[in-house]
Amino acid sequence: MNKKIIILIYLIFIKSIVGQNPVWIGGSGCNLFTDSSCWSPSTSPLTTDIVTMGVDSTQTVVDGDITITTLINNNLTLGGVEMSSTISLEIIDTSLIVSGAFSMATNSRLSLSLSDSYANSLVSGSATRNAVNVLMNLQSMQTLMVGSSFTMTGNSVLDVNRSISTINGVFTMNDDTSLFMYSKQNGDSKFTVGNSVLNDASSLNFQGQSFIFFNQTNLPSGLVLNDQSKIVAIDADNVKISGVVTLNDQSSIQLTSSRLYLDSLVTATTSSILVNNSTLSILQSIPTTFSPASAVFKGSVFTIKSNCTIQSPITMIDSVYSFNQSHTLASQFTGSNVYMIMDAAILNAGNYYDCSGCSLSMRNSIANFDSYENQGDLILSSSKLNSNAPITSNTGSIFGYYGELNQALTVESGSLGVYNEKTRLFVNGNVIVESGAKIQFYLSSPLDFSWLNTSGSLDVQSGTIIEIYVYIEILNNGSMEVIKTSNGFVTPLSTDNVKLYTYDPDNDVITDFSTTGGCEYSISITNTSVLVHTDYACQQAIITLGTDGISKGSLAGISVSMVALACFVSLGVWWKTSKKNDQRNDSQVLTNFSQNKSDDIDVERKL
């Protein structure tokens, strides 16, 4: 039979130290400040008393509910709290200040919350109580303040709903204890502790927006998960955990339709990570080793901001993998329909990269593979891809502004370049474009246009079309060398496989220039080059086949080494995302959270 004691008080913070003998509280229908049957040995606890909740004046265990809510001029500051038996304590719209330790026994429950009506009033202004001016807003409201340690045992539960609480000491969860953090409206749940340890099968559970802050004044600090303990987030929109999160033993992180942002993550080789339709971001640039027994991402985003060595298998399906700085794969990476984003990064993949239908987008970056086969989009913006074997592309496109491939390239299907993006690509070797594939170049002006420069030959096989798209509003005359080869063309080019189009990007209209009757644009094909000319004083279309290449053209003065150096030069424009309509920007990657968060460029895209 549940018995309920309503404790109506309002709390202010005062400095106190733990002392006196234990005091007990229990019974039902009591006014704690007048009825001696509720307290033993006195009718009111001192600020230094250690209070045991869940027993009556004879120290007999009493199951029941205790509710602490606001009342002017009644204040409760205690030296310590021990919740025994199956007692349930609710702290609503006020603060409980404990200078010493707080412990929860088996099956006890502590709920910290602000009511909807009170939360709304807190947002609106300020008030004065007990001659203390309190800024009545959600950021200053302390629901629970514990000066020493907080320990949970048995099956005890801590509910934090739109609460702002602080534990200055160690927060320990044992057995099957659970912490639930969630927020319905008008603010986040915030929980600040010195450091935290989870043991046995205890769990942190998140829903809505929550923030746990671990004070790093005394290292080591942060969140330590032992045994089979876990972090669980379900439909948690914006969960932030500061400090170092350490997964020991068989502990785990389990995310479903949630976003979890960590400062730093340390993983044992027996831990596990499961991310489903969620985001997991590691924000600090501290070098790290990622080594859980398993890590699976489905329909999710995984972001790492630091130098990282991947020493455990990773499986990604329909997901985004984004990283900065240096990444080394020392274990198998298996993916399907993965969009990998490198921003000022170096990837050492070796022979551990196995990704089907995957895209790689690089900005100011270098990627090193034993072998590489493109099965999606390969976007090289001031970036270089190195392979120990010739590179193949059997689907999608290869494009980007100032990209370099260190090996010969075979395009089996898809396209080299795209009609609506400028592509400038160096290939150190021969280029083969097989039947059915395309070469596409976008020419926006004689000073800024696409080109292919290969140190070998270009083999455009039967059925392959070179499509050149000229921006419809080019107004100045000039020549543009769109293809430059050192060893010429394996199969002579002609107007049968080199086509000229005009392109109106504003309306996305493409017109075959051969059908317009115009002569503003013309093509020259030599033994080693393909050039496009503009002439607004023309009388007729000019298509010429020559025998001599040009020794100095629009590519003169551009060094292959520029691409490698460009990995350390920031460009003002990155790649566009219009080519992947199934992805969307998510620019909510944590503001005002950690020192590095302002650099956290939007990388989330929902596939």
From Swiss-Prot:
- Keyword Glycoprotein attributed: yes
Instruction: Identify the residue ranges that face the Cytoplasmic compartment according to the record.
Output: 576-607
Range of residues in the leader sequence: 1-19
Biological processes, Gene Ontology terms: sorocarp development
Q: Which UniProt keywords apply?
A: Glycoprotein, Membrane, Secreted, Signal, Transmembrane, Transmembrane helix
GO cellular component terms? extracellular region; membrane
The record's section on InterPro entries has: QS_Complex_Regulator (IPR053370)
Report residues carrying sugar chains.
N75, N161, N215, N276, N277, N307, N324, N453, N477, N527
Q: Where in the cell is it found?
A: Membrane; Secreted
**TM region(s), chain numbering:** 555-575
Q: Does the keyword Thylakoid apply?
A: no
Q: How does it sit in the membrane?
A: Single-pass type I membrane protein
Domain of life, source organism: Eukaryota
Question: Ranges in the Extracellular compartment?
Answer: 20-554
Q: How does it assemble?
A: Forms a complex with psiF/dicA.
Anything else the record notes?
According to PubMed:15947191, it is secreted in the conditioned medium. However, prediction tools clearly predict a transmembrane domain. In some conditions, it may be cleaved and secreted in the conditioned medium, which would explain the discrepancy.
Q: What does this protein do?
A: Component of a complex that acts as a quorum sensing protein regulating discoidin gene expression during growth and development. Its function in the complex is unclear as it has no ability to induce discoidin during growth and development by itself.
State what protein this is by name: Discoidin-inducing complex subunit B
Q: Which gene encodes it?
A: dicB
